[in-house]
């Protein structure tokens, strides 16, 4: 009956234990990341401009389409992603968080899991993805579990999809006459 989880088998006692595997790989990113973040945002005036510049940089890196499970849940260090100019979706998310943190922007990596009755009934294989911000995930957060790397629930800011347009039509006694 669709994508309904019937049985969960995990080598981890909790979601928090599973996420420790990811969290342990996010080391102190050091001088390389800090210098790059400063260089990329040198002309920016606002926090939003800085975030946008860093996002453009990270999105401009090459993509490696391997999933977390295909990489054995291994993330390369941020400096290695910078040096190689490519990364998996998860590595690029970790790099974006590191770059933002390096210039004092509060950023955290978040994880998405299928929603389960037992909040701890999910291991690494159930991890849908890692991200800093994701409007697509924000749209469906009522149907999935979004947590920080300590497995604490996170509520994402919903984006409005309302499109508004106003046209003004001026009608006079000469309208339509030739």
Language model features with spans:
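Acidic/His-rich catalytic or pseudo-catalytic neighborhoods
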Residues: 10-17, 21-32, 151-178
């Amino acid at each position: 009956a669709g994508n309904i989880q019937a049985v969960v088998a995990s080598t981890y006692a909790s979601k928090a234990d599973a996420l420790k595997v990811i969290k342990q790989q996010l080391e102190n990113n050091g001088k390389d990341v800090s210098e790059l973040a400063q260089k990329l945002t040198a002309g920016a005036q606002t926090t939003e401009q800085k975030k946008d510049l860093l996002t453009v940089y990270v999105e401009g890196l090459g993509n490696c389409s391997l999933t977390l499970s295909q990489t054995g849940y291994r993330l390369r260090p941020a400096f290695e992603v910078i040096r190689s100019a490519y990364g998996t979706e998860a590595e690029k998310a970790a790099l974006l968080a590191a770059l933002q943190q390096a210039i004092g922007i509060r950023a955290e990596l978040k994880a998405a899991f299928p929603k389960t009755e037992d909040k701890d009934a999910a291991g690494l294989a159930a991890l849908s993805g890692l991200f800093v911000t994701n409007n697509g995930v924000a749209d469906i957060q009522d149907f999935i579990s979004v947590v920080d790397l300590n497995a604490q629930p996170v509520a994402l800011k919903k984006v409005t999809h309302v499109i508004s347009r106003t046209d003004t039509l001026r009608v006079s006694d000469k309208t339509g006459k030739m």
